[in-house]
Swiss-Prot record:
Domain named GST N-terminal: residues: 11-90
Species annotation: Arabidopsis thaliana
Protein origin, superkingdom: Eukaryota
Record has Transferase as a keyword: yes
Annotated localization: Cytoplasm, Cytosol
Protein name: Glutathione S-transferase U11
Expression induction: By fungal elicitor.
Record gene name: GSTU11
Amino acid sequence: MGLMNRSKNDEYVKLLGAWPSPFVLRTRIALNLKNVAYEYLEEEDTLSSESVLNYNPVHKQIPILIHGNKPIRESLNIVMYVDETWLSGPPILPSDPFDRAVARFWDVYIDEHCFTSINGVAVAKGEENINAAIAKLEQCMALLEETFQECSKGRGFFGGENIGFIDIGFGSMLGPLTVLEKFTGVKFIHPENTPGLFHWADRFYAHEAVKPVMPDIEKLVQFARLKFNTSIFK
Protein backbone atom coordinates (compact mmCIF):
# COMPACT_ATOMS: atom_id res chain seq x y z
CA MET A 1 0.00 0.00 0.00
CA GLY A 2 1.32 3.49 -0.78
CA LEU A 3 1.43 6.52 1.45
CA MET A 4 -0.35 9.65 2.45
CA ASN A 5 -3.54 11.48 1.53
CA ARG A 6 -6.47 10.80 -0.74
CA SER A 7 -5.76 11.43 -4.40
CA LYS A 8 -7.06 14.28 -6.53
CA ASN A 9 -10.86 14.22 -6.87
CA ASP A 10 -10.89 11.03 -4.76
CA GLU A 11 -10.05 9.01 -7.88
CA TYR A 12 -8.42 5.68 -7.13
CA VAL A 13 -4.68 5.44 -7.79
CA LYS A 14 -2.99 2.12 -8.44
CA LEU A 15 0.59 1.34 -9.46
CA LEU A 16 1.65 -1.86 -11.20
CA GLY A 17 5.33 -2.56 -10.66
CA ALA A 18 8.15 -4.88 -9.67
CA TRP A 19 10.41 -4.19 -6.71
CA PRO A 20 13.84 -4.41 -8.48
CA SER A 21 12.88 -1.97 -11.25
CA PRO A 22 14.49 1.49 -11.05
CA PHE A 23 11.73 2.74 -13.34
CA VAL A 24 9.03 1.65 -10.91
CA LEU A 25 11.02 3.27 -8.11
CA ARG A 26 10.81 6.62 -9.92
CA THR A 27 7.04 6.56 -9.87
CA ARG A 28 6.87 5.60 -6.20
CA ILE A 29 9.17 8.46 -5.22
CA ALA A 30 7.13 10.94 -7.27
CA LEU A 31 3.87 9.78 -5.67
CA ASN A 32 5.43 10.03 -2.20
CA LEU A 33 6.73 13.54 -2.90
CA LYS A 34 3.20 14.60 -3.83
CA ASN A 35 1.61 12.86 -0.81
CA VAL A 36 -0.58 10.70 -3.04
CA ALA A 37 -2.24 7.62 -1.57
CA TYR A 38 -1.97 4.66 -3.92
CA GLU A 39 -2.24 0.90 -4.04
CA TYR A 40 0.95 -0.85 -5.10
CA LEU A 41 0.57 -4.17 -6.92
CA GLU A 42 3.68 -6.31 -7.39
CA GLU A 43 3.79 -7.98 -10.81
CA GLU A 44 6.15 -10.96 -10.76
CA ASP A 45 5.82 -11.87 -14.45
CA THR A 46 4.95 -8.85 -16.54
CA LEU A 47 4.90 -10.80 -19.81
CA SER A 48 2.04 -12.99 -18.62
CA SER A 49 0.30 -10.59 -16.24
CA GLU A 50 -3.29 -10.01 -17.30
CA SER A 51 -3.24 -6.51 -15.79
CA VAL A 52 -0.05 -5.50 -17.59
CA LEU A 53 -1.26 -6.91 -20.91
CA ASN A 54 -4.58 -5.12 -20.46
CA TYR A 55 -3.17 -1.71 -19.52
CA ASN A 56 0.00 -1.74 -21.66
CA PRO A 57 -0.65 -4.07 -24.61
CA VAL A 58 1.96 -2.40 -26.83
CA HIS A 59 5.11 -2.61 -24.69
CA LYS A 60 3.90 -5.04 -22.01
CA GLN A 61 6.07 -3.22 -19.48
CA ILE A 62 5.87 -1.69 -16.04
CA PRO A 63 5.45 0.75 -14.39
CA ILE A 64 1.82 1.47 -15.14
CA LEU A 65 0.00 4.12 -13.12
CA ILE A 66 -3.78 3.79 -13.12
CA HIS A 67 -5.60 6.98 -12.11
CA GLY A 68 -9.30 6.29 -12.01
CA ASN A 69 -9.63 4.13 -15.10
CA LYS A 70 -6.87 5.88 -17.05
CA PRO A 71 -3.52 4.07 -17.51
CA ILE A 72 -0.34 6.16 -17.75
CA ARG A 73 2.75 4.37 -19.03
CA GLU A 74 6.54 4.91 -19.09
CA SER A 75 8.32 6.08 -15.95
CA LEU A 76 9.33 9.62 -16.96
CA ASN A 77 5.92 10.22 -18.49
CA ILE A 78 4.32 9.06 -15.23
CA VAL A 79 6.53 11.34 -13.13
CA MET A 80 5.53 14.33 -15.27
CA TYR A 81 1.87 13.34 -15.03
CA VAL A 82 2.08 13.09 -11.24
CA ASP A 83 3.74 16.51 -11.05
CA GLU A 84 1.08 18.15 -13.23
CA THR A 85 -1.90 16.37 -11.65
CA TRP A 86 -1.20 16.77 -7.93
CA LEU A 87 -0.17 20.20 -6.69
CA SER A 88 0.53 19.02 -3.14
CA GLY A 89 4.18 18.77 -2.20
CA PRO A 90 7.12 20.47 -3.93
CA PRO A 91 7.17 20.77 -7.73
CA ILE A 92 9.18 18.04 -9.43
CA LEU A 93 9.84 19.88 -12.69
CA PRO A 94 10.98 23.53 -12.78
CA SER A 95 8.45 26.19 -13.75
CA ASP A 96 10.79 27.87 -16.25
CA PRO A 97 10.39 26.33 -19.75
CA PHE A 98 14.13 26.27 -20.42
CA ASP A 99 14.93 24.64 -17.07
CA ARG A 100 12.18 22.08 -17.71
CA ALA A 101 13.71 21.26 -21.08
CA VAL A 102 17.14 20.86 -19.47
CA ALA A 103 15.75 18.51 -16.82
CA ARG A 104 13.99 16.38 -19.44
CA PHE A 105 17.16 16.27 -21.55
CA TRP A 106 19.25 14.89 -18.70
CA ASP A 107 16.72 12.27 -17.70
CA VAL A 108 16.67 11.01 -21.29
CA TYR A 109 20.49 10.98 -21.20
CA ILE A 110 20.40 8.97 -17.97
CA ASP A 111 18.15 6.36 -19.58
CA GLU A 112 19.90 6.19 -22.94
CA HIS A 113 23.49 6.30 -21.69
CA CYS A 114 23.85 5.69 -17.95
CA PHE A 115 21.27 2.91 -17.58
CA THR A 116 22.50 1.20 -20.74
CA SER A 117 26.06 1.53 -19.41
CA ILE A 118 25.03 -0.09 -16.12
CA ASN A 119 23.54 -2.98 -18.09
CA GLY A 120 26.63 -3.00 -20.28
CA VAL A 121 28.85 -3.71 -17.28
CA ALA A 122 26.43 -6.34 -15.99
CA VAL A 123 26.38 -8.34 -19.23
CA ALA A 124 30.02 -7.83 -20.28
CA LYS A 125 32.11 -10.95 -20.79
CA GLY A 126 35.88 -11.05 -20.88
CA GLU A 127 38.29 -8.67 -19.17
CA GLU A 128 38.66 -6.32 -22.14
CA ASN A 129 34.91 -5.90 -22.58
CA ILE A 130 34.34 -5.50 -18.85
CA ASN A 131 37.00 -2.78 -18.60
CA ALA A 132 35.57 -0.95 -21.63
CA ALA A 133 32.07 -1.07 -20.13
CA ILE A 134 33.35 0.22 -16.79
CA ALA A 135 35.16 3.11 -18.52
CA LYS A 136 31.97 4.07 -20.36
CA LEU A 137 29.99 4.11 -17.11
CA GLU A 138 32.68 6.20 -15.42
CA GLN A 139 32.35 8.75 -18.23
CA CYS A 140 28.61 8.96 -17.53
CA MET A 141 29.29 9.62 -13.85
CA ALA A 142 31.84 12.33 -14.66
CA LEU A 143 29.34 14.11 -16.90
CA LEU A 144 26.59 13.83 -14.29
CA GLU A 145 28.97 15.30 -11.71
CA GLU A 146 29.37 18.36 -13.95
CA THR A 147 25.61 18.48 -14.44
CA PHE A 148 24.99 18.33 -10.70
CA GLN A 149 27.35 21.23 -10.04
CA GLU A 150 25.65 23.30 -12.74
CA CYS A 151 22.02 22.47 -11.88
CA SER A 152 22.25 22.48 -8.08
CA LYS A 153 24.04 25.85 -7.88
CA GLY A 154 25.55 24.86 -4.53
CA ARG A 155 22.32 23.45 -3.11
CA GLY A 156 21.55 19.88 -2.07
CA PHE A 157 19.87 18.41 -5.14
CA PHE A 158 19.83 18.63 -8.92
CA GLY A 159 16.46 20.31 -8.42
CA GLY A 160 17.87 22.84 -5.93
CA GLU A 161 16.57 22.73 -2.37
CA ASN A 162 14.26 19.78 -3.09
CA ILE A 163 14.31 16.57 -5.08
CA GLY A 164 13.48 17.24 -8.71
CA PHE A 165 13.13 15.47 -12.04
CA ILE A 166 16.83 14.70 -12.53
CA ASP A 167 17.18 13.57 -8.91
CA ILE A 168 14.39 11.03 -9.40
CA GLY A 169 15.73 9.90 -12.77
CA PHE A 170 19.29 9.31 -11.58
CA GLY A 171 18.52 8.43 -7.97
CA SER A 172 16.54 5.41 -9.11
CA MET A 173 19.81 4.02 -10.53
CA LEU A 174 21.73 4.16 -7.24
CA GLY A 175 20.76 0.62 -6.24
CA PRO A 176 22.06 -1.02 -9.45
CA LEU A 177 25.19 1.16 -9.26
CA THR A 178 25.87 0.00 -5.71
CA VAL A 179 25.46 -3.62 -6.77
CA LEU A 180 28.01 -3.13 -9.56
CA GLU A 181 30.40 -1.48 -7.11
CA LYS A 182 30.21 -4.52 -4.85
CA PHE A 183 31.06 -6.95 -7.64
CA THR A 184 33.57 -4.92 -9.66
CA GLY A 185 35.37 -3.19 -6.80
CA VAL A 186 35.05 0.10 -8.72
CA LYS A 187 33.56 3.11 -6.93
CA PHE A 188 31.53 4.83 -9.62
CA ILE A 189 30.44 7.52 -7.16
CA HIS A 190 33.58 8.50 -5.26
CA PRO A 191 34.25 11.36 -2.80
CA GLU A 192 37.30 12.46 -4.81
CA ASN A 193 36.20 11.90 -8.41
CA THR A 194 32.53 12.83 -7.99
CA PRO A 195 32.27 14.73 -4.69
CA GLY A 196 28.99 16.41 -5.55
CA LEU A 197 27.28 13.13 -6.44
CA PHE A 198 28.81 11.40 -3.43
CA HIS A 199 27.19 13.75 -0.91
CA TRP A 200 24.05 14.08 -3.03
CA ALA A 201 23.52 10.31 -2.90
CA ASP A 202 23.53 10.37 0.93
CA ARG A 203 20.92 13.14 0.94
CA PHE A 204 18.82 11.33 -1.64
CA TYR A 205 18.82 8.04 0.26
CA ALA A 206 17.83 9.81 3.48
CA HIS A 207 14.91 11.75 1.99
CA GLU A 208 11.54 10.85 3.50
CA ALA A 209 10.00 10.25 0.07
CA VAL A 210 12.81 7.90 -0.93
CA LYS A 211 13.87 5.93 2.12
CA PRO A 212 10.70 3.79 2.51
CA VAL A 213 10.74 2.57 -1.10
CA MET A 214 14.44 2.03 -1.89
CA PRO A 215 15.11 -1.67 -2.58
CA ASP A 216 17.32 -3.55 -0.14
CA ILE A 217 20.83 -3.81 -1.59
CA GLU A 218 21.37 -7.43 -0.55
CA LYS A 219 18.11 -8.39 -2.26
CA LEU A 220 19.30 -6.57 -5.38
CA VAL A 221 22.60 -8.46 -5.20
CA GLN A 222 20.77 -11.79 -5.17
CA PHE A 223 18.48 -10.61 -7.97
CA ALA A 224 21.49 -9.62 -10.11
CA ARG A 225 23.12 -13.01 -9.57
CA LEU A 226 20.01 -14.75 -10.84
CA LYS A 227 19.38 -12.40 -13.76
CA PHE A 228 22.89 -11.99 -15.17
CA ASN A 229 24.86 -15.14 -15.91
CA THR A 230 28.19 -13.37 -16.33
CA SER A 231 31.58 -13.62 -14.63
CA ILE A 232 31.11 -10.34 -12.74
CA PHE A 233 28.40 -11.86 -10.56
CA LYS A 234 30.14 -15.16 -9.79
